[in-house]
Curated annotation (Swiss-Prot):
GO biological process, one term: arachidonate metabolic process
Family of this protein: Belongs to the lipoxygenase family.
GO CC terms in record: cytoplasm; cytosol; membrane; sarcolemma
Source organism: Rattus norvegicus (Rat)
Pathway this chain belongs to: Lipid metabolism; hydroperoxy eicosatetraenoic acid biosynthesis
Taxonomic lineage from the root: Eukaryota, Metazoa, Chordata, Craniata, Vertebrata
Keyword Secreted: no
Gene name for this UniProt entry: Alox12
Name of the protein described by the UniProt record: Polyunsaturated fatty acid lipoxygenase ALOX12
Length: 663
């Protein structure tokens, strides 16, 4: 018995409030009390009410909500409810962060994180079991394409659960900026109708509007070997380059290149030889766009690192050797300038395909979706790992669903302008799954495997390792609050089910690629969770943001090639290059889409700065605060370093890393 102060917090998004009447009950260990209030929640408001309750409720366990409606079911987005009452040293927090709609009564448990075996009262165990049963009906797996990771069962964005949808501001920004980009694309096409299109300088006719300062530098310097090599370290795709441990077996050195062979062997001996092998593209069928055949290649690039840290190309073999064909041509920096330039353009086209499909779509978006669906199906809201992960899966299901219906769908953007479209992209993704190993998602392992540790000019590698360590400290801090021993990890049935769901269901039996099917220790759990958070945040930032800078100037990363790869160095002319590069329509669409997808989002939530209060324990707040402080310190370090560089690396500054995959 006594006075209770109840605070109701409504979301600030458009349409978060409701004209419907909301009823509340306080549920304690002894009994429950219906509160006599007339609440019609208003967007962005915190509303407080005082109530005298005649009976002793006991320790508070739940708040119950019921939104009444007659004609219109006006959904309400409730952030949280707090209650301060007799004998309570601090207010009890009841997190919600979801839409309240329909006829039912919603039960919000008190927000203290609890493991399945920690429930002193059976009522919490029954609640989490009921919650998971309902979630498993709502969040169902589906197969988008055989051989690829499972996805959320949704044919379009409207099929998604409401709590996984974009909020209204996000939806409007996404759709209106896309329309603005299409309008700009149309203006560029009209502008070029009566103008020539036979020189590289003619791309200037469409290189206006939405672009970045780095894109301007790429525009000026893209033909330079130094910038070509730099992109393998710190560009849109820093994931393919590796230090050579031997000369690749597919490298064919024709007669007369003995000096090159000696130079390659010297660089190899000195540990300065690197390679980028696009063999994954070999045999992938190229697209046919509006009746016009497009072309693909599977290049091999050999590069050396000079004493100053510059990565410079030594040779390019555009296609792998084929027993039924003459030996592939080996292109060298000493070749006629146009021949060497066209060879580099072919490499950049191949890099576009792998960056977008293997390292962006598969290794971040689809992996994050598996994590998201498994989290919703296996971890109840009271579970500490749910509370840890849920801020990092915001919007991921909708952006991926939109991708499957607009970008990589039949007739979508890839089919319209990309050389792997028309089905080749699905074959490429299926091949790439074999390379999707657990180690490949963990920078300490991946960078060690690729020989890129302690390379001073590898800025992605440096920043990724530091972010991994900062994220790992955060995860370790949270995990050790709730798992005091390895036995508790092994004995958590919900956690073990979540692990199996990711590896065996979502990733389609990925244990043969190193993914765990169970957690045997706190260290193993922490490593896996660090991978999850890193993939959904830092890794996506590194791969996504570069599109705007490196793909805006189309010749630097053409989405498609309209002529087959050259077999002779002497026949390459400017007409050959312009005939190979995308035409006006494809170039305009490439610029539009890469700007739309690569720009910083206006509603961006930086890494670690989510406002949702899923945890209520002061100890967890301290761990999160330390994470934020570590990120701030890293931001200062990166900023200071970048001030000394001609070409700053910005993608992994914590302030530019989004807290989840939202674009």
């Amino acid at each position: 018995m006594g006075r209770y102060r109840v605070r109701v917090v409504t979301g600030a998004w458009l349409f978060s409030g409701s004209v419907n009447l909301v009823r509340l009950w306080l549920v304690g260990a002894h009994r429950e009390a219906r509160l006599e209030l007339q609440l019609r929640p208003a967007r962005g408001k915190e509303e407080e009410f005082d109530f005298d309750v005649a009976e002793d409720l006991g320790p508070l366990q739940f708040v119950k909500l019921h939104k009444e409606h007659t004609v219109v079911d006006d959904a309400w987005f409730c952030n949280l409810i707090t209650v301060q009452g007799p004998g309570m040293s601090a207010e009890a927090v009841f997190p919600c962060y979801r839409w309240v709609q329909g006829e039912g009564i919603l039960r919000l448990p008190e927000g203290t994180a609890r493991l399945a075996g920690d429930n002193a009262l059976d009522v919490f165990q029954k609640h989490r079991e009921k919650e998971l049963k309902e979630r498993q009906q709502t969040y169902r797996w589906a197969t988008w394409k055989q051989g690829l990771p499972q996805t959320i069962a949704a044919d379009c964005k409207d099929d998604l659960p409401p709590n996984m949808r974009f909020h209204e501001e996000k939806r409007l920004d996404f759709e209106w900026t896309l329309k603005a980009g299409v309008l700009e694309m149309g203006l560029k096409r009209v502008y070029t109708l009566l103008r020539s299109w036979n020189r590289l300088e003619d791309f200037d006719q469409i290189f206006w509007g939405q672009k970045s300062a780095l894109a301007e530098k790429v525009h000026r310097c893209w033909q330079e070997d130094e910038l070509f090599g730099y992109q393998f370290l710190n560009g849109a795709n820093p994931m393919l380059l590796r230090r050579s441990t031997s000369l690749p077996s597919r490298l064919v050195l024709p007669p007369g290149t003995e000096e090159l062979q000696a130079q390659l062997e010297k660089e190899l001996k000195d540990g300065c030889l690197f390679e980028a092998d696009f063999i994954l593209l070999d045999g992938i069928p190229a697209n046919v766009i509006r009746g016009e055949q497009q072309y693909l290649a599977a290049p091999l690039v050999m590069l050396r690192m000079d004493p100053s840290g510059k990565l410079l190309p030594m040779a390019i073999q555009i296609q792998p050797p084929n027993p039924s064909s003459p030996a592939p041509t080996l292109f060298l920096p000493s070749d006629p300038p146009l021949a060497w330039l066209l060879a580099k353009i072919w490499v950049r086209n191949s890099d576009f395909q792998l960056q977008e499909l293997q390292f962006h779509l598969l290794n971040t978006h689809l992996v994050a979706e598996v994590i998201a669906v498994a989290t919703m199906r296996c971890l109840p809201g009271l579970h500490p790992i749910f509370k840890l992960l849920v801020p990092h899966i915001r919007y991921t299901m909708e952006i991926n669903t939109r991708s499957r219906t607009q970008l990589i769908s039949d007739g979508g953007i890839f089919d319209q302008v990309v050389s792997t479209g028309g089905g080749g992209h699905v074959q490429l993704l299926t091949r790439a799954v074999a390379q999707l190993t657990y180690c490949s998602l963990c920078p300490p392992d991946d960078l060690a495997t690729r020989g890129l540790l302690r390379v001073p000019s590898a800025l992605y590698a440096q920043d990724a390792l530091q972010l991994w360590e900062v994220t790992a400290r955060y995860v370790n801090g949270m995990v050790h609050l709730f798992y005091q021993s390895d036995d508790i990890v092994r004995g958590d049935p919900e956690l073990q089910a979540w692990c199996r769901e990711i590896t065996e269901v979502g990733l389609c039996h990925a244990q043969d690629r190193g993914f765990p099917v169970s957690f045997q220790s706190r260290a193993q759990l922490c490593h896996f969770l660090t991978m999850c958070v890193f993939t959904c945040t830092s890794q996506h930032a590194a791969i996504n943001q570069g599109q705007l800078d490196w793909y805006g100037w189309v010749p630097n990363a053409p989405c498609t090639m309209r002529m087959p790869p050259p077999t002779s160095k002497d026949d390459v002319t400017m007409e050959t290059i312009m005939g190979s590069l995308p035409d006006v329509q494809k170039s305009c669409l490439q610029m539009t889409i890469t700007w739309h997808l690569g720009r910083l989002q206006p509603d961006m939530v930086p890494l670690g700065h989510h406002k949702e209060k899923y945890f209520s324990d002061p100890r967890t707040k301290a761990v999160l605060s330390q994470f934020q402080a570590d990120l701030e310190n890293l931001e200062k370090e990166i900023t200071a370093r970048n001030q000394q560089l001609d070409l700053p690396y910005e993608y992994l500054k914590p302030s530019r890393i989004e807290n989840s995959i939202t674009i």
